[in-house]
A protein has these predicted regions:
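Double-stranded beta-helix
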Residues: 8-73, 93
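Non-heme Fe(II)/2-oxoglutarate
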Residues: 68-164
Length: 164
């Protein structure tokens, strides 16, 4: 869920989402063998030109499926584009990668908004690609994405055609 803290129009780089892309299956988010949290538009057959801008006034809420191909367009204005992002998941959707930075099950449970703590993670027959090996320069998701040479959102831009 995103909440715009500023008015967001097509000039100051709105969140862009490709409708229906969450139904295409797992997309590789690796660059040169390492997880980077972004996809290469040249290697990924996706209708990037179909990305829809999510514009709105400050206070607008945006929602999209976590597997939807999404990203922010370049901010081509002098206006800021602050966005508060909040993720929600089921109480039984444990991090398969384990807890990080010394976190424990108690820390995980403290985040429960609705539901009950469980020691039985839900495992469904869905494709999952683990984020291994970790990025060479592990940092924020935005830092990790910088290792990908071909990025549609934020570099190649929604107004530029991706060519193979």
């Amino acid at each position: 869920m995103g909440v715009y803290l500023e008015d967001v129009d097509e000039d100051n780089g709105p969140m862009m989402v490709i409708p229906g892309s969450h139904k295409t299956g797992v997309i590789d988010h690796h660059s040169e063998g390492y997880f980077c949290g972004a996809i290469d538009p040249i290697k990924t057959p996706m209708a990037f030109s179909q990305a829809v801008p999510l514009t709105g006034a400050a206070g607008t809420i945006t929602l999209h499926h976590v597997r939807s191909v999404h990203g922010s367009a370049l901010n081509r204005s002098a206006k800021p584009r602050r966005l508060l992002l909040q993720g929600y998941f089921s109480a039984d959707a444990w991090p398969l990668n384990g807890f990080r930075n010394g976190q424990s099950i108690d820390d995980f449970d403290a985040l429960i908004v609705r539901g009950v703590s469980t020691l039985e993670p839900r495992l469904a027959n869905i494709p999952v690609k683990m984020p291994f090996p970790k990025a060479l320069h592990q940092g924020s998701i935005y830092e990790n994405q910088q290792t990908l040479k071909n990025r549609y959102f934020g570099s190649m831009g929604p107004n530029k055609r991706v060519t193979k």
